[in-house]
Design a protein with these regions (language model features):
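Macromolecular interaction modules
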Residues: 2-332
Length: 332
């Protein structure tokens, strides 16, 4: 049986999609952090105007009062699973497909980075220890000592790469993106950020198929200007990361994204000064990296540069579109 790949995103990445020679100058990335549509009160998670659409196309202003009205999924027990599936299997192919009159040719890469709660995070870092009571044994009544869940601000990242900044408008200004892709975002996401970043690939990926990423969102120490923070992150901190033996052992890709502006009003994304993304072969490799003595030195360096609002978490990677092979380190 021959599989029909019509309109599938397989056609937009290897081995089916065509690729071009790598680019060595810093690329431009719209590092779009997303939070999913769900019944969380707006007091706990902000919501973009017009998002969280109902089946009738209207914004559900108070989703915690009317979760059943959400177009994506009205059953709260299925809300996360349905959202995770929709983003990858429905929204991703819509973004990648060139409908008549549109072209995504200037999108060099589109990666979806889905946060996974079981992975390490700044809210619950490894090592993970067995819980014990005063008697040194496991709790006899575990129902009374369930740890609270620390929820990161974002549920994932749309990592969209362009050769130059003007290409963003050339792509997103098309009717397909400006109308129908935005409409689809309003079904799936309660908020998306709009920051533009300059990408520095410090450790290139061999195949750009590394399954797991550690995403570090940096908000600078208030004593530093954004310019000074970004300079020190790239010129001082990044060489420290690269120089650790644990990085050599575990890290398959390392990129730093420096915020240089936004495509539109961006109250949440504008707070982010930079993002570090380190990719790994497995979730256990992330855990082992974070508990290494080498990473302790990295964490101390980060702590001196960053401030309130910084967070990190682990995610699963999906390469939806990729036109660049092989990946190479950025020349500076």
């Amino acid at each position: 049986m021959t599989i029909d790949f019509d309109r599938s995103d397989n056609l937009q990445r290897p081995p089916m999609g065509q690729t071009r020679d790598p680019i060595t100058h810093p690329l431009i990335v719209t590092a779009t952090f997303v939070s999913r549509v769900d019944s969380t009160p707006r007091s706990e998670r902000p919501q973009d105007a017009g998002s969280a659409k109902s089946k009738h196309g209207n914004e559900v202003h108070l989703p915690n009062w009317r979760p059943g009205a959400l177009a994506l999924e009205g059953n709260e027990n299925l809300a996360f699973e349905h959202w995770d599936e929709y983003w990858r299997k429905v929204h991703g192919p819509k973004f990648a497909w060139d409908e008549p009159g549109s072209s995504s040719e200037r999108v060099l890469r589109y990666d979806q980075v889905h946060r996974i709660a079981s992975g390490p995070s700044s809210f619950f870092p490894p090592p993970y220890r067995a819980m014990i009571g005063d008697d040194g044994k496991l709790p006899a009544e575990p129902e009374k000592c369930v740890p609270p869940y620390g929820r990161p601000r974002w549920d994932g990242l749309a990592y969209i790469t362009y050769a130059e900044q003007d290409d963003i408008e050339r792509v997103l200004g098309q009717e397909k993106f400006a109308e129908r892709i935005i409409a689809d975002e309003q079904v799936a996401f309660r908020m998306v950020t709009r920051e533009i970043t300059r990408e520095y690939i410090l450790i290139p990926s061999a195949r750009h198929r590394d399954p797991v990423s550690l995403v570090k969102i940096h908000m600078r120490n208030p004593d530093l200007s954004r310019e000074e923070f970004q300079r020190r992150l790239l010129d001082e901190h990044a060489p420290l990361v690269i120089g650790q033996s644990a990085t050599t052992e575990f890290v398959k890709r390392y990129a730093v994204l420096l915020n240089i502006g936004s495509t539109q009003k961006d109250p949440e994304g504008s707070k982010i000064d930079a993002v570090s993304i380190l990719s790994f072969a497995s979730l256990n490799d992330v855990e082992d990296y974070l508990v290494s003595s080498d990473h302790e030195a990295i964490a101390q360096s980060e702590a001196a540069l960053t401030g309130e609002g910084s967070e990190w978490w682990t995610a699963i990677n999906y390469s939806v579109m990729n036109r660049l092979m092989p990946e190479v380190a950025t020349e500076r």
